[in-house]
Amino acid sequence: MSEESCLFCKIIAGEISGEFVHQDDHCVVIRDVNPQAPMHMLVIPRQHLESLDDASQKEEGLLGHLLRIGARIANLQDHDSYRTVINTGSGAGQSVFHLHVHVLAGRGMSWPPG
């Protein structure tokens, strides 16, 4: 998928409306449109990477930042228990091919996830 046709790139660029729960120089956070928990946020890097497989060593700092922002957002929503998920590839449930971290909270979660 090219950046020009990427849903998340269009949201980040303001071409498609989206309410940012958080934004900084490296990422934005939006609510998932199909939530799987009472709190379900997506932490999306501004840099277009199709999946975790496309991240190189130079993106290690960015990946850490995405996880820290996810934790901060969960804590600001008064959740001290939450799950972070990165789906990589369609077989793992990735439906938008722009790397993003799901942050889910507000209900009990079991293991394995499914």
Show the residue positions of the predicted features.
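HIT superfamily nucleotide-processing domains
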Residues: 1-114
